């Protein structure tokens, strides 16, 4: 009998801790208006680094280090990738996986209804399936902050983004998310 009670206790205590994890992640997201961070991005083995700012909902500005002054900007509706080579790519944001990653309300709703997975005891992962997109979102197991994502990009490349050195709710310049003009 004691063995059965122990098993029940372990089952309910682990369920509570899983619910508590989700609650902490959701609370962190609710309290976050923007994040400034450094990133390392691996697209099919090609590593790029840089700095980004995300402002919820759906805005992002990234400067890539050592890559022809590459920038990535979303104003909430469109996504532009520009380099000084010159190349200029313009996409409707809603046709990219970033549309979901940059939508805090969407993330919160998905986290509420998705089973989390603990990876190596360090990371909390939510696998989100939406409109033919598979999006893996990762959070830190200690502070419950966003630490990265994995998607398939518009060219069908595996894209893994790790973020670090987060600064939350910084004062941002008004024109940060203005789309650059084509040369």
What residues fall within each predicted segment?
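A generic structural motif
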Residues: 40-42, 63-65, 82-84, 129, ...
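Boundary at the C-terminal end of the N-terminal hydrophobic targeting segment
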Residues: 16-19
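Extended beta-sheet lipid-handling architectures
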Residues: 34-37, 49-52, 62, 161-163
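A charged amphipathic helix-loop-strand protein-protein interaction module that recurs
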Residues: 94-113
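Sec-dependent N-terminal signal peptides
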Residues: 4-13
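Gly/Pro-enriched, hydrophobic low-complexity segments
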Residues: 109-110, 114-183
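An acidic-aromatic
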Residues: 52-100, 159
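A short, Trp-centered hydrophobic/proline-enriched beta-strand micro-motif
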Residues: 27-47
């Amino acid at each position: 009998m004691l063995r059965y009670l122990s098993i029940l206790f372990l089952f309910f205590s682990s369920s509570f801790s899983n619910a508590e994890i989700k609650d902490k992640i959701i609370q962190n997201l609710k309290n976050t208006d923007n994040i400034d961070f450094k990133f390392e991005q691996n697209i099919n083995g090609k590593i790029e680094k840089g700095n980004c700012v995300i402002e919820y909902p759906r805005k992002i500005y990234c400067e890539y280090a050592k890559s022809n002054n590459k920038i990535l900007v979303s104003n909430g509706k469109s996504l532009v990738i520009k380099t000084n080579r010159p190349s200029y790519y313009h996409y409707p944001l809603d046709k990219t996986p970033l549309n979901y990653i940059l939508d805090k309300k969407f993330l919160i709703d998905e986290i509420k209804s998705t089973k989390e997975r603990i990876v190596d005891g360090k990371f909390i992962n939510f696998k989100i399936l939406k409109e033919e997109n598979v999006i893996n979102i990762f959070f830190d197991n200690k502070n419950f902050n966003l630490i990265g994502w994995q998607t398939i990009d518009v060219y069908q490349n595996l894209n893994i983004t790790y973020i670090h050195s987060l600064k939350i709710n910084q004062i941002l310049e008004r024109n940060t998310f203005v789309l650059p003009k084509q040369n």
